[in-house]
Amino acid sequence: MRLRRTLLTLALAAAVFGAAASAQTPADRVDPFIGTTNFGTANPGAVTPHGMMSVVPFNVMGSEENVYDKDARWWSTPYEYHNKFFTGFAHGALSGVGCPELGALLTMATTGPLTVDYREYGTSYRDEKASPGYYSVFLDKYGVLAEATATARSSAERYTFPEGTGHILLNLGEGLTNESGAMVRRVSATEIEGTKLLGTFCYNAQKVFPVYFVLRVSKTPSAGGYWKKQRKMTGVEAEWTPDNGRYKLYTEYGRELSGDDVGYWFSFDGLAAGEQVEVRMGISYVSTENARKNLDAEQAADAPFDAIREQARKGWNEALGRIRVEGGAEQQQRVFYTALYHALLHPNLVSDVNGEYPLMERSGETGVTDGERYTVFSLWDTCRNLHQLLTLVYPDRQREMLRSMTGMYEEWGWLPKWELYGRETFTMEGDPAIPVIVDSWMKGLRDFDVAKAYEAMRKSATTPGAQNRMRPDIDPYIEKGYIPLGFYAKDLAGDTSVSHALEYYMADAALSLLADSLGHGDDARLFRARSLGYKRYYSPESGTLRPLHPDGTFLSPFDPKAGENFTAAPGFHEGSAWNYTFYVPHDVEGLAKLMGGRRKF
């Protein structure tokens, strides 16, 4: 009898567990904290699929208690899980990149006496919670619960205060970006607008661009005003101001304020315990007018925070739900859906609700699209698998991305390599737009201007190096079939010639397929032949690809393992000869033959 009761209990438990598991949505299986440690450079912020806006906890500055500080080492993310000093929410951030950028427009809630120095107003925190489209945290110093959610182009934050005086701060002087310069203007007691300069991504000092914002608070403040960090003065000059080298509060100034380290504060006296103040922000990369339009279009004035949060969650369930996973452990499903979640962050929207967007490499000029314009084309990172996934599962979005890429060619004469908000950073190597576009075409995604795309691809594959923005080292590639050591980088420790050539081989192999599909037989044969030039790099002695000197001799001495753990490896970028030797996906059988047959391969 006891055994029967036990079996019945187990059966009921299994039924309940199965019902609970089946009731889970794809968003329930996402853990946004995955990838936020060990230099994963992900973050747990609130964002929608491919959203322009993200609201990210900023915890990488201001305290020696942090394990990682953005200014103390190479650092490229606004958040690290092991850090414990919170200095606000950043609006607009990159995920998974290797260079610091964006992560600015920092909002913060505080209580008690007003202070605007982030080293002083920052706080420890606890009780972090994150799910797709939502993030919350409890701020220890202030007893404030901070929550954030987002729409495609705007954000909503909700701060639950204890009894007393509370403040909302907007810090425009700090952020992850290495650029400085901002402007803020009071529109009304509850609304401000302005702009912040961003850019200088991956050592590209001239690749800068503005982000525009409109910010509103839900409650009329008791007071408000600007702040600015004053320059350090010496001697008699210093006697003229009590704020020498410190943050100065402007309580009687009502026009716009500009500077490298400026901000705005709202104060709320007499808050009841549990009273909430909400902050809404719209952004644009075109204008403050468009930032306001984005905010008004995506958030009704009386839209509850929880309704916006639920809308974001619904969007994620629709996007993640295009793939249904069965079987496997719960942890495996969580890993899968979190990876899919991360795959749907970039490229992201740059066009506003009215279709306007910044033209490619034409600073200050604006275009209009009747669809969506995308940005953050980190194509060296994504050309091999991300866009193939989008083509198969999200063809509607991939189609708009293809149109965005061909639009960039029409606007400045080249397809993107590593494009960031209308600026080409030329980060990494190769001609990675080609395999992305060709793969989509060959899979049947054809609702874009393929003739224009082919024109762009052929241009980068044939233009001499001196005029070639995509392949500046193409001359020896065409003449010799390979790129010799020292041609593009005189310092061999920084030479990546083999990596460059391998990217071109893959691009030309893809281009030959498209040429054949479009009936350009001569081009198809030409680019196919070029794609097989990798064989010149093969060294029977090492059994790997090996860098070549201009005279055709192999680099010697040579260690095919050099490059492990980011050590210097002449000829190779972020990898070793063993890593790169197998990077000929267009001719695997040919590589196996070079190596002595399939068994040895």
Task: Enumerate the predicted regions with their spans.
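Bacterial N-terminal signal peptides
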Residues: 9-18
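Sec/Tat signal peptide C-region and signal peptidase I cleavage site
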Residues: 19-23
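ATP-dependent phospho-/nucleotidyl transfer catalytic cores
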Residues: 507
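Accessory carbohydrate-recognition regions in carbohydrate-active enzymes
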Residues: 24-383, 387, 391-435, 441-502, ...
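Bacterial N-terminal signal peptides that target proteins for export
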Residues: 1-10
